[in-house]
Amino acid sequence: MSLLTEVETYVLSIVPSGPLKAEIAQRLEDVFAGKNTDLEALMEWLKTRPILSPLTKGILGFVFTLTVPSERGLQRRRFVQNALNGNGDPNNMDRAVKLYKKLKREITFHGAKEVALSYSTGALASCMGLIYNRMGTVTTEVALGLVCATCEQIADSQHRSHRQMATATNPLIRHENRMVLASTTAKAMEQMAGSSEQAAEAMEVASQTRQMVQAMRTIGTHPSSSAGLKDNLLENLQAYQKRMGVQMQRFK
């Protein structure tokens, strides 16, 4: 795996799924391929994106700044600085300075990532802030290693939270989760559907599902009433994919 592929993988792992994720992936690909060289416009676009947490925006802004060639005196952006200040906690700043000194001695991406992984997310963000604000300089490879370590920590905590959701025993949470997943799968079916006969069938199933979920939410239903909702939908989606000759593992 090339360095930039690895960076893209880690960064995208902390972006919530949806159309915006696809858009960010495209921007990252363009930047890494040297196709997008207008850092100012890129940062303005990033700043106004909805859904993303300030820290995710800060990390993306940091990556764009590292990889897009720009004039030396280009202004640093406040939204990135605020996100990478370690919540203003002086402990984070102290640890960030210690980490920075260690990173100065590193020359490889993987070496930097290994060193950084033993620090907290707050300290890692503060360290990125130091580099972003030009208070310290490290090689681009080392800075990207720091980025990936931060993303790995964030993705780990998100994964734990998703796992807790998947194993939640509260029937109301499970009920709502099934309806959300059914709705999302229905949306995916609608996006995949082209204009063939089978597509019309898939659209019909998806539309009915979404109406059903809407009705269940409006009138309030028993937690067990959603059992099987997502599974039925997934079976329909997989049958439709087979007929269309499409294999999309990610919906399983």
UniProtKB/Swiss-Prot annotation:
Residues 165-252 are annotated as: RNP-binding. Gene3D superfamilies: 1.10.10.180, 1.20.91.10. SMART domains: Flu_M1_C. Pfam families: Flu_M1, Flu_M1_C. Keywords: Host nucleus, Membrane, RNA-binding, Viral matrix protein, Virion. It is a peripheral membrane protein. GO terms for cellular component: host cell nucleus; membrane; virion membrane. GO terms for biological process: viral budding from plasma membrane. A motif (Nuclear localization signal) lies at residues 101-105. It is found in: Virion membrane; Host nucleus. It comes from the Viruses. Residues 1-164 are annotated as: Membrane-binding. GO terms for molecular function: RNA binding; structural constituent of virion. Belongs to the influenza viruses Matrix protein M1 family. Plays critical roles in virus replication, from virus entry and uncoating to assembly and budding of the virus particle. M1 binding to ribonucleocapsids (RNPs) in nucleus seems to inhibit viral transcription. Interaction of viral NEP with M1-RNP is thought to promote nuclear export of the complex, which is targeted to the virion assembly site at the apical plasma membrane in polarized epithelial cells. Interactions with NA and HA may bring M1, a non-raft-associated protein, into lipid rafts. Forms a continuous shell on the inner side of the lipid bilayer in virion, where it binds the RNP. Determines the virion's shape: spherical or filamentous. Clinical isolates of influenza are characterized by the presence of significant proportion of filamentous virions, whereas after multiple passage on eggs or cell culture, virions have only spherical morphology. Filamentous virions are thought to be important to infect neighboring cells, and spherical virions more suited to spread through aerosol between hosts organisms. Most abundant protein in virion. When expressed alone can form virus-like particles in transfected cells. Homodimer and homomultimer. Interacts with NEP. Binds ribonucleocapsid by both interacting with genomic RNA and NP protein. May interact with HA and NA. Cannot bind NP without genomic RNA. This is Matrix protein 1. It comes from Influenza A virus (strain A/Silky Chicken/Hong Kong/SF189/2001 H5N1 genotype A). The lineage of its organism: Viruses, Riboviria, Orthornavirae, Negarnaviricota, Polyploviricotina.
